[in-house]
């Protein structure tokens, strides 16, 4: 391929590319471009056309212009008003810019012009035929190019000219056209163009299919419209009503019968008017119909009549649940007030207690006792505010919130509405559902609760809301303030036994297809299951164990191994395996540095053993067992107090300087925190530093201060019941927790002895077994040591005998 060097003025093109053999009009308005054309006209009318990389650039530089362009001849020049000119140019040949001679007052470049020489072999012929065929198909489908163009293209013998003319007729991007222009080799250019035309064919075919589909849809819509208009005319002649008018009249009739509040009725009628003006097939019409259906399905004025019979309600509650005195009493109080005050708003109760104690099922029993509808929604894991208030109708697939959905499910405006697991809600970027619940659970506001979907106030003041939670400290304070909290503690052993006999056994026997004649389980056997196979505040695991016994019984009967099965304490292991827990004392022997404490979690109470040991070192204290900051600080406070009382306790000062102290609380994988183990850790430290053993049948709880005072703690009932389960006989509690002993069942108090203390000295006097404390100068009797203590008084040392508890010697 031969080439020659030429010096020509340069005309930068914006948004257009000129191929060789292409004739086109160009409107020129930039000063540099006009001067370049005028220079070409003065010389031999030859000019170099190159396209800009970015059409938006008004003052292009060397880097803004493609290097390869087209040498063209200016055929005509016409000056237009406004200082612009229009030129007719014809492309001659490809050329490449070798260098820019100057850029002012116009671009002038030295270009290398390519002349095309080729040998028309079989490959070139095949590519030409393929390209011509594809171009013919493209022209037929696109209908953008005159058919005459195909005739002129078919007769071309020069492959380069064929490619350039076809490329000039295609609607390609500037980048793709430039790619073809830069293909100097004939075969390369033909191959590229074949690929481009094939791709364009696919696009044109897709466009054709889309156009056909759209046209058919339009024809269908027009046909439907025409037929509907005809149907309207026919109905009018026959005196029949339009379907849309009939639908709207039906909605109006239903609204008038529904006894809506005034505001809701106005809103519904307004939506009916909107529906009447819409085309029946409009998407918005479906949204309005759905909205009206929701409005009509809500119980605006429907309510059930309460069964205000306290005795009957008590019978229902007692039949369904054993124990749970406080919530049952609150329900009967509500009934009594309802009988006297007819317009009383529904109470908002929050049942707080460990899992498995019957909080959720109690809500269902309350509804049965009041003869009301019952609705339950679980709030566990809810983190979207729209779950409570609903979505606005502007969203696709919008629905009311779960409160309004629950009211529709209930079908009455005064159901018992249970909000389960209210402490398990979360919040994120979508909002805070607990804040949305503030309006629902506020008696002063919920009479005008507004859902985003309904957009009109709905009265919730007659609803009896009951919420449940395992841990009330996880509930946001403003929300907790709106509810009446009722604490439900774990069941006692006797309560579990009665629940198993009255409820769990009959239920599981029936569920497993057995009869009472087929299986017998004694009370002692159930007690053994409670004591040695479960350790929980509720009865869920107990029910699972009873279910396991029933399954194995059913298997034996079906297999023909027995007609009747009797489960006793001797053969219980055949049904449940080896006991999982040891029932009896928490520790079997009196030991130095080992003390039983009491803990309270959201799943109930438990006992924990605190171990302390010493070894030679530098006086450091180590704490292990995954303890929280509060618990570590409590241990430090106890250690500081013991160190300050070393002389009175008979502890050598070297123990604090040359011996290290290690405090460990077993089950190290479980996080522990809180101040209630303060006196327990202090007692264990005093024991190991004095060498005095601690009673194994004793448990204690209480916070300690640097002065040795014992402060009150929470969860006393749960802690005491856990200690009772572990076989503890004597419990040490802060004196300020005396009021909490009233919550402990009488039968539990009869089996325990309680010591109420105000100071750690009293704790040590009770817990440490040796009778004398050796001072560095004098030996004091225990009583004398206690009386010499300025923190101790006769009132402080009082011992509370609870329901037959025996007094231990001090």
From Swiss-Prot:
Location within or outside the cell: Cytoplasm
GO molecular function: ATP binding; ATP hydrolysis activity; ATP-dependent peptidase activity; sequence-specific DNA binding; serine-type endopeptidase activity
Broadest EC class assigned to this enzyme: hydrolase
Listed EC numbers: 3.4.21.53
Residue positions of the active site: 676, 719
Single GO cellular component term: cytoplasm
Residues where ATP binds: 353-360
Residues in the signal sequence: none
SUPFAM superfamilies per the UniProt record, alphabetical: P-loop containing nucleoside triphosphate hydrolases, PUA domain-like, Ribosomal protein S5 domain 2-like
GO biological process, one term: cellular response to heat
Hydrolase keyword on record: yes
CDD domains attached to this UniProt entry: RecA-like_Lon
Induction info: By heat shock.
UniProt domain Lon N-terminal: residue ranges: 8-201
Keyword set includes Protease: yes
Domain Lon proteolytic: 589-770
Superkingdom field: Bacteria
Entries under Pfam families matching the protein: AAA, Lon_C, Lon_lid, LON_substr_bdg
Catalysed conversion reaction: Hydrolysis of proteins in presence of ATP
Keywords: ATP-binding, Cytoplasm, Hydrolase, Nucleotide-binding, Protease, Serine protease, Stress response
PANTHER family noted in UniProt: ATP DEPENDENT LON PROTEASE FAMILY MEMBER
NCBIfam families recorded: lon, PRK10787.1
Known partners and oligomeric status: Homohexamer. Organized in a ring with a central cavity.
Protein family membership: Belongs to the peptidase S16 family.
Name of this protein: Lon protease
Species assigned in the record: Desulforamulus reducens (strain ATCC BAA-1160 / DSM 100696 / MI-1)
Taxonomic lineage from the root: Bacteria, Bacillati, Bacillota, Clostridia, Eubacteriales
């Amino acid at each position: 391929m031969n080439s020659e060097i030429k010096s020509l003025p340069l005309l930068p093109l914006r948004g257009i590319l000129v191929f060789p053999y292409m004739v086109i009009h160009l409107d020129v308005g930039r000063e540099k471009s006009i001067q370049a054309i005028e220079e070409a006209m003065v010389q031999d009318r030859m000019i170099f056309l190159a396209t800009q990389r970015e059409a938006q650039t008004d003052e292009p530089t060397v880097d803004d212009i493609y290097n390869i362009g087209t040498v063209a001849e200016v055929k005509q020049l016409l000056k237009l008003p406004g200082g612009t000119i229009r030129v007719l140019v014809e492309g001659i040949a490809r050329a490449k810019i070798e260098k820019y001679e100057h850029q002012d007052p116009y671009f002038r470049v030295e270009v290398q012009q390519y002349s095309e020489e080729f040998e028309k072999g079989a490959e070139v012929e095949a590519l030409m035929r393929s390209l011509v065929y594809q171009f013919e198909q493209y022209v037929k489908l696109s209908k953008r190019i005159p058919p005459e163009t195909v005739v002129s293209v078919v007769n071309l013998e020069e492959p380069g000219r064929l490619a350039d003319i076809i490329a000039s007729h295609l609607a390609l991007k500037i980048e793709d056209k430039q790619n073809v222009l830069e293909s100097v080799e004939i075969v390369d250019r033909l191959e590229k163009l074949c690929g481009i035309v094939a791709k364009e064919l696919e696009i044109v075919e897709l466009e054709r299919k889309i156009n056909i589909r759209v046209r058919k849809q339009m024809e269908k819509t027009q046909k439907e419209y025409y037929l509907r208009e005809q149907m309207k005319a026919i109905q009018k002649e026959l005196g029949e009503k339009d379907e849309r008018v009939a639908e709207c009249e039906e909605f109006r009739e239903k609204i008038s019968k529904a006894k809506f509040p005034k505001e809701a009725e106005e809103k519904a009628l307004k939506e009916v008017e909107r529906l009447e003006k819409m085309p029946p097939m409009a998407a918005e019409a479906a949204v309005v119909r759905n909205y009206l259906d929701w409005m009509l399905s809500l119980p605006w004025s429907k309510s059930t009549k309460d069964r205000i019979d306290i005795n009957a309600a008590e019978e229902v509650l007692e039949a369904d649940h054993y124990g749970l005195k406080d919530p049952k009493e609150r329900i009967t109080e509500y009934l009594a007030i309802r009988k006297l005050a007819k317009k009383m708003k529904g109470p908002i109760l929050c049942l707080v207690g460990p899992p498995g104690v019957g909080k959720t099922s109690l809500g269902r029993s309350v509804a049965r006792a009041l003869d009301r509808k019952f609705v339950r929604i679980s709030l566990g894991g809810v983190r979207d505010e729209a779950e409570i208030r609903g979505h606005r109708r502007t969203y696709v697939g919008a629905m009311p919130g779960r409160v309004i959905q629950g009211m529709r499910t209930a079908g009455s405006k005064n159901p018992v509405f249970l909000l389960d697991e209210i402490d398990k809600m979360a919040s994120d970027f979508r909002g805070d559902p607990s804040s949305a619940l503030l309006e629902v659970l506020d008696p002063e506001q919920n009479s005008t609760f507004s859902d985003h979907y309904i957009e009109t106030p709905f009265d919730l003041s007659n609803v009896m809301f009951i919420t449940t939670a395992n841990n009330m400290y996880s509930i946001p304070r403003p929300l907790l303030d709106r509810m009446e909290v009722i604490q439900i503690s774990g069941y006692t052993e006797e309560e579990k036994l009665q629940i198993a006999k009255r409820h769990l056994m009959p239920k599981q026997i029936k569920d497993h297809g057995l009869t009472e004649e087929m299986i017998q389980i004694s009370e002692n056997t159930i007690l053994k299951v409670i004591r040695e196979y479960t350790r929980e505040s509720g009865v869920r695991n107990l029910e699972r164990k009873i279910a396991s016994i029933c399954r194995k019984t059913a298997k034996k009967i079906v297999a023909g191994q027995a007609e009747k099965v009797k489960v006793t304490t001797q053969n219980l292991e055949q049904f449940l395996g080896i006991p999982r827990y040891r029932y009896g004392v928490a520790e079997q022997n009196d030991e130095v540095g080992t003390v039983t404490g009491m803990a309270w979690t959201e799943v109930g109470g438990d006992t924990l053993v605190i171990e302390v040991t010493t070894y030679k070192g530098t006086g450091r204290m180590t704490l292990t067992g995954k303890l929280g900051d509060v618990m570590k600080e409590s241990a430090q406070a106890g250690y500081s107090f013991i160190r300050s009382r070393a002389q009175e306790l008979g502890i050598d000062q070297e123990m604090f300087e040359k011996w290290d102290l290690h405090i460990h609380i077993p089950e190290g994988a479980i996080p522990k925190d809180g101040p209630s183990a303060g006196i327990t850790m202090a007692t264990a430290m005093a024991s190991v530093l004095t060498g005095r053993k601690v009673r194994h049948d004793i448990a204690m709880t209480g916070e300690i201060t640097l002065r040795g005072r014992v402060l009150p703690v929470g969860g006393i009932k749960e802690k005491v019941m856990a200690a009772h389960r572990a076989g503890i006989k004597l419990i040490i509690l802060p004196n300020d927790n005396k009021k909490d002993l009233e919550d402990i069942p009488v039968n539990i108090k009869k089996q325990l002895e309680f010591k109420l203390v105000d100071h750690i000295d009293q704790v040590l006097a009770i817990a440490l077994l040796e009778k004398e404390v050796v001072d560095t100068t004098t030996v004091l009797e225990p009583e004398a040591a206690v009386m010499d203590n300025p923190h101790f008084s006769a009132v402080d040392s009082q011992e509370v005998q609870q329901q037959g508890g025996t007094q231990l010697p001090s």
